[in-house]
From Swiss-Prot:
SUPFAM superfamilies: Aldolase. Its EC number is 4.1.2.40. This is Tagatose 1,6-diphosphate aldolase. GO terms for molecular function: 6-deoxy-6-sulfofructose-1-phosphate aldolase activity; tagatose-6-phosphate kinase activity; tagatose-bisphosphate aldolase activity. The keyword Nucleotide-binding does not apply. It catalyses: D-tagatofuranose 1,6-bisphosphate = D-glyceraldehyde 3-phosphate + dihydroxyacetone phosphate. InterPro entries: Aldolase_TIM, DeoC/FbaB/LacD_aldolase, LacD_aldolase, Tag_1.6-dipho_adolase. It comes from the Bacteria. Pathway: Carbohydrate metabolism; D-tagatose 6-phosphate degradation; D-glyceraldehyde 3-phosphate and glycerone phosphate from D-tagatose 6-phosphate: step 2/2. Pfam families: DeoC. GO terms for biological process: 6-sulfoquinovose(1-) catabolic process; D-tagatose 6-phosphate catabolic process; lactose catabolic process via tagatose-6-phosphate. The keyword Protein transport does not apply. Keywords: Lactose metabolism, Lyase.
Amino acid sequence: MSKSNQKIASIEQLSNNEGIISALAFDQRGALKRMMAKHQTEEPTVAQIEQLKVLVAEELTQYASSILLDPEYGLPASDARNKDCGLLLAYEKTGYDVNAKGRLPDCLVEWSAKRLKEQGANAVKFLLYYDVDDAEEINIQKKAYIERIGSECVAEDIPFFLEVLTYDDNIPDNGSVEFAKVKPRKVNEAMKLFSEPRFNVDVLKVEVPVNMKYVEGFAEGEVVYTKEEAAQHFKDQDASTHLPYIYLSAGVSAELFQETLKFAHEAGAKFNGVLCGRATWSGAVQVYIEQGEDAAREWLRTTGFKNIDDLNKVLKDTATSWKQRK
């Protein structure tokens, strides 16, 4: 991994003293609006969304090495973060066009890597939906798109964090048994691809390679993977890249995410941290809407703190320094 001194210094600002990225993800936009809409009849307002992000930043960033925010609703929160907390800013538009095939990527049109850097970002994050089994006419567009962003980040000398979410258009439910069977290959092959130097990715933000709800010992119903098979998928994931990689929480509970990290570590995965979002703060949404700012702050200081503190303890025992991979 040949990174510039500036990129290395920037990633250091995003990680803790042990070289582990213990980052808080709150760049949700569409998903957050849907969460909020469950608890109120009117459309969530810009002020509501911005204020909730500010609350989370004020209360939890002292316990995180960095925070991932979006430049659409998250800039007030970026100003409210702890002075020692690094900043990643998202570059992609939220969601994808459900009417078009391929889940093609799209940048926020009024932003660039240069502008995100000027806004104070220590890194640019971009989310890509990718299916290694999709038609090449779709995937070549995605590869070219990531090459552009990678080149932009090289030009601005700012780290590029690529988040890859896998899918299969033929399997609408990615929580299904059918998707669980194909997920390991899709996750690990995508990681392998985007580790190629041509993409100039510095850190991969990825899914765990299995659906833990179908792993023997974790499953309540059908088992798709034995513990040994699941462990092998984590080993294969680690071998699929030379780049630092961190796990996303994918909306699972705090407890399951922590158990997953322990399992990954025991399997031999030398992951370098997390970008954990909903598993840490999701419970604050309902409290904020139904009981107001003070109650949400109290939730963040108690349950939210416990979630992030427990996660940090697990990371201390399970994650390895990204510097071992460079």
